[in-house]
Amino acid sequence: MIPEDHLQYIRIGLASPEQIRSWAERRLPNGELIGRVSKPYTIHYQTHKPEKDGLFCERVFGPIKSGVCACGKYQGTISTKDSPKYCEKCGVEFTEARVRRHRMGYIDLQCPVTHVWYLKNRPSVIARLLNQPLQDIESLVYYDSFLARPVTNEPTLIRLLPTQSKLYKDRSQSTFDKPLELFLFDEPWQSALSNFFSPKWFHLIQIREMLTGADVIHKLLSGLNLTNAMFHARNQWKHLAKKAPESQSEVIEAQGPVPQAEEEKQRDQSIQQQKDAVLRRITLIRDLLQSQTQPEWMVLRTLPVLPPDLRPILELKDGQLIRSDLNELYRRVLYRNQLICQFSVEDPFCISMMQKKLLQQAIDSLLANGAGGNIIRDRNMRPYKSLSDIIKGKKGRFRENLLGKRVDYSGRSVIVVGPYLSLYQCGLPREMAIELFQPFVIRGLIINHFARNPRAAKSMIQRRHPIVWKILKMIVDDHLVILNRAPTLHRLGVQAFQPVLVRERAIHLHPLVCTGFNADFDGDQMAVHVPLSLEAQAEAHLLMSPYFNLLSPGTGDAIVVPTQDMLLGLYALTLGATLGIYSNINTYKYQSDVSFTQKTDSKIITFSNFSDALTAYHQGIITSDLPIWLYCRPEIAVMNNSQGDCPVEAQYQPKGIYLNVYEHSQIRTDKLGKTVQKYIRTTAGRAVLNQQIEQAIQGTEHAYKAVKQLNIILN
């Protein structure tokens, strides 16, 4: 086992048979090698003690009680320099009982077995790697067909048979990969052949010339050179690329009758599908080369056995035993593994072939119950939980126990919408914040001389002294929190926010960041974590802020975009007359109790700056859709509806000042044509939106400046 302090990362992948053995095999001081599970037994039905060499064997997995051997010769003995390291009689090592939680065993399989994850999953890794149809691969794995074994370079007996017995016939085959020549077991010539030869010689012919089962897949995968396969796959892709049209215009401009153009389209689609398949195969081979994984490891010759404490047998008070489903599935594998040895002596081919098929199905059920065929059930017709069922889903080992652990300085609550928040802010409940930041609050109370010791500070926190909230407010202003929503499917599921204390018990979240979390406000919950170290806080500032997660990492598209009620709100806020100065703001096509604008016969109000317009809006003097004339800087360009920008009205004023009135603007120029004054026709709602956009841009600029300064300090 790797020491915990040396563990830097975990990588899930294929393991070689030698590596699986190294996980479980140990050598006793007398030279005996242990670790192999050979008997399909768990515990004795009377004594409830583990059976030797069974699934709960103490020699293989360690003692049930610390320092107590299986035979009872030694009681409470822990291995030291002077005491023996194991019991000479039963072979149990003197060690702690907790080793049964991580010590593994292994089953030495009597025949190769294909890993169902790499065979049955869509897409099938084995079928893609061998570049063969999945149907043909499955017929070989489950002993429905066979290959003619190439014993010599000369034609074999089966290869001289008529070609109509080939299962693989008239299939579109690739340029560089030959299809498999498969033969069915129920062909008429087989019965005639068995009558011609004696049973002994017929069995020898079958062994000599028929190759089937996972042994075929192992030979094909072990004979596969990944480097050459990559070279051929790339050449195949180039060959297909030459067949494809250079542009879509060649298809559109095709001359001749319509059926001919339709055939060309179908041919191009077929070529594109072949190119996609070859590209996926290239990607798979590249991943195998980079991870230094051998393809033949997808066929199991050694099956690892989980530690017994991960598949326990528990005894209730009334004496009833509760067993893990994995124990029954392991027993089924061991039973069928033993039967192969027994029948291989009596019948070298037929019966042993059926036993190998049963072993393949048993291991399929152990790894993924139901993937290889029928679902195995218990007496109550409840399906057994396989390894796949244990580790997948919300209640699986990863999401329930490993990723879903309770951690310190974390909390969880329901999320609600917080439209008043900035993009980088979140509303944190005060009761949750006082618990998350309690050590920081205690330190703040002591430093500011409000408490003499931690005990007095905790007492103030429990009494909710008013000064506690002020200290907490100072702390959260300088500290980010990390929000996470399960399942974390991509890095946007974990982002850092500046907390804002709220009195409610729900977490307030800005609606624009919901897309990254895949969250909505119908009862979803989110977890809050507090980064403690300086490195974690710097990473939260530099990498995890919503300002630096505006684009999707998968597609590159903008992920922070307004949707639904935000778009309706922006539309209502910026709603105004669209006909310029010709529109009659007092005329509406409909009447309602609550109108957007109060009817008035006054002229359009003129404002000299944004502040006056916003003040009038907030005081209720004007409404959001009431047209106003608003002063703007002369250098700001104004977009008019007319193509030629012709003024609707032109006035000549004293001192040579010209006033040109357009549909959406008024421009005053001097004698030299220089713009002196400019007013734009807009609404108070659009002025509010403009102010919000300016503040957001300024906030982003300040954030980038802060990041640059922090980078300079760190470097």
Curated annotation (Swiss-Prot):
<feature type="region of interest" description="Disordered">
    <location>
        <begin position="244"/>
        <end position="272"/>
    </location>
</feature>
<dbReference type="InterPro" id="IPR007080">
    <property type="entry name" value="RNA_pol_Rpb1_1"/>
</dbReference>
<comment type="function">
    <text>DNA-dependent RNA polymerase catalyzes the transcription of DNA into RNA using the four ribonucleoside triphosphates as substrates.</text>
</comment>
<dbReference type="GO" id="GO:0008270">
    <property type="term" value="F:zinc ion binding"/>
</dbReference>
<dbReference type="InterPro" id="IPR000722">
    <property type="entry name" value="RNA_pol_asu"/>
</dbReference>
<dbReference type="GO" id="GO:0005739">
    <property type="term" value="C:mitochondrion"/>
</dbReference>
<keyword id="KW-0808">Transferase</keyword>
<protein>
    <recommendedName>
        <fullName>DNA-directed RNA polymerase subunit beta'</fullName>
        <ecNumber>2.7.7.6</ecNumber>
    </recommendedName>
</protein>
<keyword id="KW-0804">Transcription</keyword>
<feature type="binding site">
    <location>
        <position position="87"/>
    </location>
    <ligand>
        <name>Zn(2+)</name>
    </ligand>
</feature>
<feature type="binding site">
    <location>
        <position position="522"/>
    </location>
    <ligand>
        <name>Mg(2+)</name>
    </ligand>
</feature>
<keyword id="KW-0460">Magnesium</keyword>
<keyword id="KW-0240">DNA-directed RNA polymerase</keyword>
<feature type="binding site">
    <location>
        <position position="71"/>
    </location>
    <ligand>
        <name>Zn(2+)</name>
    </ligand>
</feature>
<dbReference type="GO" id="GO:0006351">
    <property type="term" value="P:DNA-templated transcription"/>
</dbReference>
<feature type="binding site">
    <location>
        <position position="90"/>
    </location>
    <ligand>
        <name>Zn(2+)</name>
    </ligand>
</feature>
<comment type="similarity">
    <text>Belongs to the RNA polymerase beta' chain family. RpoC1 subfamily.</text>
</comment>
<dbReference type="GO" id="GO:0003677">
    <property type="term" value="F:DNA binding"/>
</dbReference>
<dbReference type="GO" id="GO:0000287">
    <property type="term" value="F:magnesium ion binding"/>
</dbReference>
<keyword id="KW-0479">Metal-binding</keyword>
<comment type="subunit">
    <text>In plastids the minimal PEP RNA polymerase catalytic core is composed of four subunits: alpha, beta, beta', and beta''. When a (nuclear-encoded) sigma factor is associated with the core the holoenzyme is formed, which can initiate transcription.</text>
</comment>
<dbReference type="GO" id="GO:0009507">
    <property type="term" value="C:chloroplast"/>
</dbReference>
<dbReference type="GO" id="GO:0000428">
    <property type="term" value="C:DNA-directed RNA polymerase complex"/>
</dbReference>
<keyword id="KW-0150">Chloroplast</keyword>
<dbReference type="GO" id="GO:0003899">
    <property type="term" value="F:DNA-directed RNA polymerase activity"/>
</dbReference>
<feature type="binding site">
    <location>
        <position position="69"/>
    </location>
    <ligand>
        <name>Zn(2+)</name>
    </ligand>
</feature>
<dbReference type="Pfam" id="PF00623">
    <property type="entry name" value="RNA_pol_Rpb1_2"/>
</dbReference>
<dbReference type="InterPro" id="IPR006592">
    <property type="entry name" value="RNA_pol_N"/>
</dbReference>
<feature type="binding site">
    <location>
        <position position="520"/>
    </location>
    <ligand>
        <name>Mg(2+)</name>
    </ligand>
</feature>
<dbReference type="InterPro" id="IPR034678">
    <property type="entry name" value="RNApol_RpoC1"/>
</dbReference>
<dbReference type="InterPro" id="IPR044893">
    <property type="entry name" value="RNA_pol_Rpb1_clamp_domain"/>
</dbReference>
<dbReference type="InterPro" id="IPR045867">
    <property type="entry name" value="DNA-dir_RpoC_beta_prime"/>
</dbReference>
<keyword id="KW-0862">Zinc</keyword>
<dbReference type="InterPro" id="IPR042102">
    <property type="entry name" value="RNA_pol_Rpb1_3_sf"/>
</dbReference>
<dbReference type="Pfam" id="PF04997">
    <property type="entry name" value="RNA_pol_Rpb1_1"/>
</dbReference>
<keyword id="KW-0548">Nucleotidyltransferase</keyword>
<feature type="binding site">
    <location>
        <position position="524"/>
    </location>
    <ligand>
        <name>Mg(2+)</name>
    </ligand>
</feature>
<keyword id="KW-0934">Plastid</keyword>
